[in-house]
C-alpha cells in the first residue's frame, strides 16, 4: 500500500443481509468508472480458517479465486462488479488471524509477551489489511462482515478504529449501512433502529462519516434531517439504498444521488467525472429481455439458493446476452427417482447438475442425467455434475452397473472417479493426499489450464485451443476407464496441460451434452458473460422453441 491509498470501511447495523457486499461493490464500480484503480476486501468474523468446509446451507457459496483461495461469496459480487480480480489477500477470517498469531507465538516471535486481542490480534488484522493492498491501488473498499454489536466483530472494528488514527481522516472513511423499517399499518418510516446502530458504533469509538439507509421506499428530507440530528452525520452524507429490480442497478441509483461525488469530495480524490455508459448498457440489456427459458438445477442445497450464487448469476448473465430471462427451477435431488423423474423435467428447456460433496441425493442426480441424455434435453454438468455424468455413462452405456466414485462408495470395485493423490498447497509445496487427509485446503483449487480437443464442441464454443477455468475438487475421472468410455462414444474434449486429468466431456450424438470438472461460473460477469453458459442457454432456447 502506498502513502496515497485511501481506505473506505463498510460496516452494517440493525440486521444482517442488508446488502453490504452489493453496496461495497457498487461504490467500487462508481469509483472505477471515474478512472481510479479500485480493489476490495472482505473481513469475516467467524473462527473457521476459511469457508471451505462450511455447509453451503449455512454460509452460502464458497467462491474460488484465480490463485486458489476459498472465500466468501461476496468476493463473487466484487468480481462481477469491478474489473480487478480477487486473491487470497482479499478475504480473511478471525480463524486465519488467530492461526497466524498462534504460529508466531509458537515460534517465539513475541519474545515471551502475553498474547492478547489488543494489541496482537488487532495488529495482525491491520497488517493483513495494509499488506494486502498493491502499491498501484488508489482506493480499497473493506467490508466488515457481521453486524455492529456482534461480539465476533469487535476485534475488526477495534482494528479499523486504530487505522483511522494511524492513517488519518484524509485517508480513511467509514460508511455504515443500516435499516429504516417501513411500518405499513402506520405508513411510517422508523429511524430509531438506525439511531441505535450508529450509537452502538460510536460506543466502539467509530463515528460514521456516511450513512446508507436500506428502505423499501424512498424517504424524504424530514427523515434525513432527523437521522442527521441524532447520528452526527451530515445530511448530505445520508443516502438511500432502495429496492431495485436487479442488483446491477444499484451503482446507477447511488450515482443519481451523488454518492460517488461525495466520496471523491470527502477523500479528496483526484478523479474524473463518472463514465457509466458501459454499466448503463449492462442494465439496459437486463431490463430489455423479452422471452423466458426455464432451466432445472438438480442439487442438494436448493433450499438456500445462495449456495449456488455464482452459478445462478452465470445463467442469468448468459440469458441477458441471449435476450431471455432465465427462470431456474430448483429440484431437490433427494426427491427424484425413476418413477417421478419425468414430472420434474417435462416443463423445462434444459437440465443442470452443479457441484457438491457427499453421497446425499446422488442417485437422484444420476437419474436426472440419464433422463437428459436419453431424451435429448440440453445438459450441463459442473464439477460433481461431470463426475456423475461419467458414472451414469459407465453404468448405462458400458454396462458397469456398480460404477461409482471412491468418494461416495469407497469400497466400489469400479471407481470410475478416483482421488487425486497429489496436490499443491497455497505456498506452492506439493503434498500427497489420501482418503484420510484433512478436508480443509486440500483440494485442486484455483485456475488451471485446459487444452481443448480439436473438432470438439467445446473447442467450437470457446474459440480457443486452451482455456483457464477455476477448480475446487479432490476427485477426477479414473484414467484406467478413459479408453473404454471413449470407445463407447464419450468424448473427453478437455484435458489438463499434462494430459493426465480429464476436464471436459461431451456426447457428440446428443443435441447439447457437456460437463466440466471446473467451475466456469466463477469467471462469468454481467459485462462479458461466459461462452459456455451462453452456448448452453442458446441450446435451451432452441429446445424450448421446438
From Swiss-Prot:
One record GO biological process: pyrimidine nucleobase biosynthetic process
Coiled-coil zones: none
Pathway: Pyrimidine metabolism; CTP biosynthesis via de novo pathway; CTP from UDP: step 2/2
Alphabetized Gene3D superfamilies for the sequence: 3.40.50.880, P-loop containing nucleotide triphosphate hydrolases
Binding site for ATP: 17-22, 74
Binding residues for Mg(2+): 74, 143
InterPro entries referenced in this protein's UniProt entry, alphabetically: Class_I_gatase-like, CTP_synthase, CTP_synthase_N, GATASE, GATase1_CTP_Synthase, P-loop_NTPase
Binding site for UTP: 16, 190-195, 226
Molecular function GO labels: ATP binding; CTP synthase activity; glutaminase activity; identical protein binding; metal ion binding
Record EC number: 6.3.4.2
Regulation: Allosterically activated by GTP, when glutamine is the substrate; GTP has no effect on the reaction when ammonia is the substrate. The allosteric effector GTP functions by stabilizing the protein conformation that binds the tetrahedral intermediate(s) formed during glutamine hydrolysis. Inhibited by the product CTP, via allosteric rather than competitive inhibition.
Domain Glutamine amidotransferase type-1 per the UniProt entry, residue ranges: 294-546
GO cellular component assignments: cytosol
Annotated CTP binding sites: 16, 150-152, 190-195, 226
Top enzyme class: ligase
Disulfide cross-links: none
Stretches the record annotates as Amidoligase domain: 1-269
PANTHER family: CTP SYNTHASE, CTP SYNTHASE-RELATED
More info: CTPSs have evolved a hybrid strategy for distinguishing between UTP and CTP. The overlapping regions of the product feedback inhibitory and substrate sites recognize a common feature in both compounds, the triphosphate moiety. To differentiate isosteric substrate and product pyrimidine rings, an additional pocket far from the expected kinase/ligase catalytic site, specifically recognizes the cytosine and ribose portions of the product inhibitor.
Family: Belongs to the CTP synthase family.
Functional description taken from the UniProt entry: Catalyzes the ATP-dependent amination of UTP to CTP with either L-glutamine or ammonia as the source of nitrogen. Regulates intracellular CTP levels through interactions with the four ribonucleotide triphosphates.
Entry protein name: CTP synthase
Organism: Francisella tularensis subsp. mediasiatica (strain FSC147)
